[in-house]
Amino acid sequence: MQTRNAFSWLKKQITRSISVSLMIYILTRTSISSAYPIFAQQGYENPREATGRIVCANCHLANKPVEIEVPQAVLPDTVFEAVVRIPYDMQLKQVLANGKRGGLNVGAVLILPEGFELAPPDRISPEMKEKIGNLSFQSYRPNKKNILVIGPVPGQKYSEITFPILSPDPATKKDVHFLKYPIYVGGNRGRGQIYPDGSKSNNTVYNATAAGIVSKIIRKEKGGYEITITDASDGRQVVDIIPPGPELLVSEGESIKFDQPLTSNPNVGGFGQGDAEIVLQDPLRVQGLLFFLASVILAQIFLVLKKKQFEKVQLAEMNF
């Protein structure tokens, strides 16, 4: 009986341990996958600074292109596509957090005019849903529905991201007007070089924090290096820690200068930003334009008919 109770207790403990381990794994995976937008969302009230710079550039230091395509004009209460393209060489591999190589992720932030927001699912057409795929967009803040973020997502599949946008209706939103509005976009591919707290990631170059002789290089068991730099004048030693990922450029016995690169720069990604303009068009203005064009066409037709009638009269008089 005691043996059976002990076995039952051991079984419960093993099951509990497995459940806890699984929960920790899931939570860890979730925090890593959603880290990039969270860095900006937690650190900045607005992703676009007064200078026009998007804050993602503070962590992604390399400058890369990004493209945005939107309609020239849209009508009120209409769903349209904002297509963001983040081009890069699909053959490239980036340094992951563990020092290994892997594919690049991409992410984007779309800053829309006030009143514009993510289209509700029931307003999105099947064709647009197919373009969107399995992407899940979120607002930058609960009170900033006009600012949307996405990522990180696999760059191999989503280097082109389609945002479904709903235009506002000035009839129901009095602070919205029929005007031309700017749209801003930022897009990154790959991991950043600096974390929000100012510390470096392993996806950047590491420089010497002192001048002297490289007296010792220790390769760490889990990857990375400990580099001891000895000052030739007073013997003072400084140890620089290199995380797994960057390739070492110096060797023992080498004389180095302050701020000299100790490693290569493994970064193959970067961040870019751009802008576009969109007109919120008044339907009455469109109707007026169509009426004007129709009247011009009718006037041209009547003019041609009148001219032909006049020519017939002239021809009849000449024959008479």
Swiss-Prot record:
Residues 1-35 form the signal peptide. Pfam families: Apocytochr_F_C, Apocytochr_F_N. Keywords: Chloroplast, Electron transport, Heme, Iron, Membrane, Metal-binding, Photosynthesis, Plastid, Signal, Thylakoid, Transmembrane, Transmembrane helix, Transport. Its main location: plastid. It comes from the Eukaryota. Heme binds at Y36, C56, C59, H60. The gene is petA. The chain crosses the membrane at residues 286-305. This is Cytochrome f.
